[in-house]
Amino acid sequence: MMSEPVRVAITGGSGRMGRTLIEAARQQPSILLGAAIERAGSTLIGVDAGELAGVGAMNVAITDSLDKVVDDFDILIDFTSPEASIVHTDWCARNGKAIVIGTTGFNHAQKEQISAYSESTPIVMAPNMAVGVNLMWKLLEVAAKVMGDYTDIEIIEGHHRYKKDAPSGTALKMGEVIAEALGRDLEKCAEYGREGITGERDRETIGFSTIRAGDLVGEHTAMFADIGERIEITHKASSRMTFANGAMRAASWLAEEDPGLYDMQQVLGLN
């Protein structure tokens, strides 16, 4: 017997990612779009979310308030900004809703706030919802343990010209995975870009390089380079749909979970 679909709401419904999330919800029979939210004052308030996303009417009008749709969904999917995500997570904690957070760029204090909310609220938070990226993190752990102490490690990432944070949350997570596997502290060994006369490279460092150009959806490479050979582990996303589908998968999984702070590794059973 088929279970009831998971009712979701999507914040930032008119944005590029918001429209992709609406499209993904439309495509998946296990998901039911219950609400789509935009900021107050938007000219799109009242527009059908499905028509906005180009997938046909879904009988869900864009609204400017979570309070107005509190009875229409069980899980909020949030790809907005760190400040907005904190507000939305607080609302979910007060109203008995779970939340999937795909926002990046949180500072340490904001991460601590979300962790505190998870004591009473089921939360999946991941800097990248793509299944392939989460598999890549597992491969990086293996590569770091085998080669990390004997190679120079560089992380190169590229995104579209509109992305606001750098390095990307995915790139930072790559660094965290590698550093943890090697017993290093990323805050102490990360090197963000180079300029001028830098001297010989310190093998203990993990380098980060950032590209912002055109309409790149997301490209990430970790390089383990020695004299005479190197290994590169790369993930390239060609569509935001890969992130949206991962978010829907996370929502379906989270519907059965108790309060806590989870990541996509747990959603996918990779831990």
Swiss-Prot record:
Residues annotated for NADP(+) binding in this entry: 39
Binding residues for (S)-2,3,4,5-tetrahydrodipicolinate: 160, 169-170
A GO cellular-component term linked to this record: cytosol
CDD domains on file: DHDPR_N (cd02274)
Pathway(s) served: Amino-acid biosynthesis; L-lysine biosynthesis via DAP pathway; (S)-tetrahydrodipicolinate from L-aspartate: step 4/4
UniProt-recorded Gene Ontology molecular function terms: 4-hydroxy-tetrahydrodipicolinate reductase; NAD binding; NADP binding; oxidoreductase activity, acting on CH or CH2 groups, NAD or NADP as acceptor
Active site: 159 (proton donor/acceptor), 163 (proton donor)
Main location: cytoplasm
Entry binding sites for NAD(+): 12-17, 38, 102-104, 126-129
Reaction catalysed by this enzyme: (S)-2,3,4,5-tetrahydrodipicolinate + NAD(+) + H2O = (2S,4S)-4-hydroxy-2,3,4,5-tetrahydrodipicolinate + NADH + H(+); (S)-2,3,4,5-tetrahydrodipicolinate + NADP(+) + H2O = (2S,4S)-4-hydroxy-2,3,4,5-tetrahydrodipicolinate + NADPH + H(+)
Superkingdom as given in the UniProt entry: Bacteria
Homology family: Belongs to the DapB family.
Function description: Catalyzes the conversion of 4-hydroxy-tetrahydrodipicolinate (HTPA) to tetrahydrodipicolinate.
Name of the protein in its database record: 4-hydroxy-tetrahydrodipicolinate reductase
Species the sequence originates in: Shewanella sediminis (strain HAW-EB3)
Phylogenetic classification of the source organism: Bacteria, Pseudomonadati, Pseudomonadota, Gammaproteobacteria, Alteromonadales
